[in-house]
Every structure is written in C-alpha cells, then in structure tokens.
Amino acid sequence: MAETLISPGVLARENDISFIAPAPTEAGAALLGPTVKGPVEEPTVVTSYGQYQRQFGTTFESGSNKFEFITSIAAKSYFEQGGNSILVTRVVSGSFTGATNTALTASAVASQPFALETISKGALLNNATGSNPDTAVHNSDGSINLGTADNLRWEISNVNDAQGTFSLSIRRGDDNTKSKIILESFNDLSLDPNSENYIERVVGNQTKTKSSDGEVTYISTVGEYVNRSRYVRVSSVNNPTLNYVGNDGITVGSNGVTSFSGSLPIAQSGSFQGAAGNLYNGIVPNNHFGSISNTNTQGLTAANYTDAISILENKDEYVFNIISAPGLIYYFGNHKVQLDSIISLAETRGDAIAVVDIEQYGATVSNVTAAASTVNSSYTATYWPWLQTQSATGKNEWIPASTVIPGVYAFTDGAAAPWFAPAGLTRGGIPNVIQAERKLTRAQRDTLYNSNVNPIATFPGAGISVFGQKTLQKKKSALDRVNVRRLLINLKKFVGDVSRNLVFEQNTTVTRDTFLAQVNPFLDSVVQRQGLYAYRVVMDDSNNTADVIDRNQLIGQIFIQPAKTVEYIVLDFTVEPSGATFGA
C-alpha cells in the first residue's frame, strides 16, 4: 500500500525518469531476387555470406553452362564491406515445393513412421539421376549418384528399441559413407508426443504459406513447433508411439510388448525427392548480367517480383534500412511497375532507402539522364555506370550498380555513421570490381549529377569510387542528399521506438519527461557525431493543450538542422610579385 500523510509529517517520494534507451536497431539491407535454392518468397535474415551460401546457394548448372545469380554477388559484396545482416527474399517463376524423404522403413508397420520435407524448395533438392528426377540411385557405400552440395540426404542411426529412441542426421547430398558431411544431427529422438524429445518438438514441423486478404500479401505459419533444423521439417508422424508402462512396471507399449521396435525406423539412409520448381520455368535463353532484357531477367519476368515486394510492406515484421532488387532496370517497361512499387514501399515505410538501376547495360549518358528525370523521390537513389566483376563461376560479368551500393552504405555505417555521405575516396570505394563500363569524364560526371544520378568514377591510382550522393528528389532541399535522408531514417527509427513504449501511458508531464529524457541525449550524441548542427524538441503544454489531451494524443515537435557535406571545394591561388610581404 502506498504511504499517505494523515498527520503532519514528511513524505519522501521518488520519480525515476533515468530510463536507459536501447541503441537504434541496426537493420541491414533487403535483397530481392532469384537464388539457387532456399525458401520461396519468405523473407529470411542472413548474418554472413557463409550462411547465405548454405541457405540460398551460389552457382548452378544449366546444360553445359554454369551460372551465378546477381543476388549472390550482392550478398557477398554487402558482407565483405562490413554489413551485419541482410533480409533475403527469394523470387521464383512458377510453383515451387519442398522435397520429401524417400521411404523410411519401420520394423513392423506398413507405413513409414514419419516423413521429412526440405525447407528449401525446388527440383534442385531432388537428389537423383538425370534420367529420373524422383528416384535416387544408391551406390554400394551408401552414397547417391549425382548428389550435389545443394541437395540433402538423411540418415537414421543409434536405434534403441528398448528406450524407443533414435538419431537423425542431415547430410550433404554429395558425401558418402566413408567421408560423411553431416550438416546437423538430432539425438535421442522419440515418436512419443508426450516426450520432451518428440521428433516434431525437436526438429520442428512448421511451414510457411503465402496468403492475401485482397489488400496485403503476408506469410502465415502452419505448425505447432518452431523449426530448429535449418534444412528440414517433420511433415507428418504416421505412427506415434506413446510411452506406456505395463501394469507390471516393466513391459513397455500399449499392448504390453517389451520394445518399441514395431514402429521405430531401422538404421538406414536415403535421399529426398518429389520437389517441383525449375529455376528457369521454360524461359530460354535465361538472360543474365549484361543481357538482361525487358521480358527476361535471369530467367524470370519482372512480374515474378510482385508478391515478394508486397510481403515487405509490414514494417513491424521486417526491418531494414536499404532495399535493392538488382536485375530490375527502370528503363524496361515491364520492370517499371515493380520498381515503382519498391520506391513506393520505401516511401510508405519511411525507414529505408531504395537503390534502383535506371538504365540497361550499354546505355549512354543521355539515356541515363533521360530515364532519371522520370523519377521523383527522396527515398530513392541511383548510380551509374555498370561494373565488371568476377563471378563465382570464374567468368568476368557486368553487374548493375545496385548490386554493390548497399555494401558501400554498410561500409559507411561501420566506418562513420549513416548520416555521413556514402561517397568519395574515403568511404565510397568499391572493392572487388575489375572496371567500370565507362570511365567518366568530369563533364559527364557533371551532367549525371545535375540529373540526380550518382556517378561511379575511376581515378588513376585510387580505384573505382562512388562520386555522388544525391537522391532522385527533384525539389532542391536538404533531402535531395542521401546522407540527410539516411539521417532522417535513423532519427525517426529511434524516436519512433521510444514513442511506441509510451502508448497507453498516462498523458501527463511524467510521460513527456520520459520521452525527453531519452530523445534529447540521443540527439546530443548525433550532434557530437557530426550528424546535426543543432536541434530543438518541444513536448510541453504549448503543443499539448487540453483539447489535444482530450483527443488522447501526445504531440512532439522535433526541429533539426542536418549537417551538410562538402561536395565542392574552391581553392584560390594568388601569385604575388617578388618582394611582396605576407601578413601574419
């Protein structure tokens, strides 16, 4: 019970407004595009390039050719530049499903005791011969013909009939019994739903489905148990075995038998099969890199990106500060709808900047400036020209600038802060590229920059660097610069997080002081870190009148003066005559 004063005395009370605010969430880049494998149209956080390779693959073969998707190059560039995480949304054409395990043999039941399904989707997961994509061929040592690093196999071991337990291993598809490559293992699994080691509980049984309510496309989760496996889920348990103990306290099983051997799997290994979904879905030729066209971007059409873009609208579920879909080119009419959707997505969310490519490979400066003039958004930036890099296939390929620019942003965030310009020789360098499509002259850079296109310049001895930081906003204001837009994104994210914690609190001075006690120190730190010249925060009776309070509102006004960058340096050299004196 709170202390009260009935008779004269002193009541000491305390009011703690020294809350320690969390640092702004450090979200990474959202990448949309085709991948070799992985979940389809399911935004997935990846925290290293090695993890990306395991989940989404790197290269694949089609006929006698070997390919790499631009998405893979973008992911590698981002992590090499110091990025912490990316949100990958795989785009496909056609229907893709997971592969299921080949028949698991049980000791004494007609059906297999349980079934597994790969989390990754597509026919690539079928570990089989080319003549029959749904039937794997096993060799005498237990290996599988034509297995690859991109598909899987399963193995049952350590079967204990007395205890009703067994082990499950997921192995890489190109290994063999003499040299196993075990990706993950689960031990002491049980088919008893009441057991802590019940296979669905330990491995997981969830699957994701794409749904729509007519306005928004979203991902629904089906299944009770979170997937702890990175590669498979339990799609069904056909013969659950309850751990009954007989009346004598010794015998086990509902029928009084002394073991679980009737429904347990025997020690064995096998492959996965039955997955649907081809990387190209019949689009031939599959145009990659510099050959991307209006109707063919890496074996897809631009329309294939529609649902993936829509899914990312939910800013409460998916957090990122950059979005890029390398392979979509604004110049192409069929791509324009999807890129407009990405730009609109960034504007609506208000917490990310879209990096888009304006022109196809081989365009001229006038082509680029003409295309850029059709876009007007402070949440969008474009860069030119294209760049040449070495693909994982060993070939030199041409890639659009949006492939590597998120990496430049990541480097800037790590080396300085989001409100520093991701440009120049200090922070704008682009590593691991061979050459730019064009070595721009000073006049060409001026023409591009006047049209809000950020030039990628080549300087002798200094390499290839981003040499501009404009957004595609046509109106001249502070927000026509990338560093200011990213500053605002960062500030709004922090202040928004603080404000969210105050919703449903009492509309009193205590709540206002709580807000100010967190926001003012943060803005002070931004001033000290060269992001702002000055700021002022107003949240008091002047803007929270009785009428505002009666409407259940709390109003805060934040006035800022963003720090500007040095983009033009003027140096005056004056030649003095002999005998001239210089003042102190």
Role assignments for model-derived ranges:
Residues 138-161, 309-314:
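Intrinsically disordered, low-complexity regulatory segments in eukaryotic proteins
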Residues 46, 183-186:
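Conserved aromatic
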Residues 1-124, 159-167, 171-177, 194-197, ...:
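Structured, hydrophobic secondary-structure cores that serve as assembly/anchoring elements
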Residues 186-195:
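Short, flexible N-terminal segments of the mature chain
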Residues 176-184:
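Surface-exposed loop/edge segments in extracytoplasmic proteins
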Residues 106-118, 122-149:
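Polybasic, low-complexity Lys/Arg-rich tracts in intrinsically disordered regions
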